[in-house]
Amino acid sequence: MSYRIPTPPPSLEELAKRQQNVVTASQLRARGVPARVITEHCRRGGPWRRLLPRVYLLQSDGPTPEQRLWAALLYAAQNGREEGREGAVITGAAALALYGFAAVPRLPAVTGVDVLVPRQRRLKDAGEVRIRRTGRELVARSVHGLACAPVARAVADALCEWTEEGAGVPMPVREVLREAVSRPDSRCTVRELAAELTESGLTGEPRVRAALDELLAGERDFVLDRVGELVDECLLPVPLAGPELRMRGGTFIAVPDLYWPERGVALEVDSDLRCVSEGEAAWVRGGQHRMEYLGIRVVYVSGARLAADRDAVGAELREAFQVGGTDVVELMVD
């Protein structure tokens, strides 16, 4: 039988180096530093500073921006444990500054630090630390050694933060959303961002909704351009783009992305990207169901599938065009 020898905890010097000279009271006690010594060292003119409740800076100089973030994270994460660095993530504008977003102030100018913790944690705001609670499982990404919320969540919390501060606060909404999905290190997908903004209830804010709609439309336009190239390669006739289909009596049916009236074939591209609310999703699904009920053959194409298996999408499109719709009801096309 083999035995695993437990790894000894890092010394105070090693811990201070890892956490940029910021430590908690429990970490100090675990290394033999009594409360009396901590109090003495933090007196005026002493070698240490108390930054937040139970969080100390092992230097007499003021904290750097990074040390302020370490203090915020350790304050929110500790739970009476010696190595309490889990259970909290930095989010909002502070996280975006760590990620390097150009549209938000740099770290020295960030005046508040939002920290996300589980809903059941009993923790109060302290100093510049604002506690945000979530009922979802925390997901952390290490950025310069600090636990940060994923980009989509950090963006949503930053927008909530700016919205709560009032209408007079400048909100670089469009710039932040664009940067979230367009940076070379693949910040997040448009779908992830849309889902997070919807979950946070931000899509009812006009500026957020307008910027999100712009992103969604751009994503779909990109995929539609690729589909157009595929249609040309398959030697298919040029389809109608975004026509409004109605019954002879004027009853609305749907607005497919592409439609070949001579074959009764419609194509829908990433239809979920047309929808932010459940009501919009129901409207789109209703149109698709009506087309299928009336005999139109509907081909569904996603950008991910088109990128991964372009030949298979082309084969499906050619087959659909060859077979055509089934007993298609005569429709008016606007």
List each language-model region with its residue ranges.
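Short gly/ser-rich loop at a beta-strand->alpha-helix junction or flexible surface loop bordering the NTP-binding
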Residues: M1-G204, Q322-V323, V329-D334
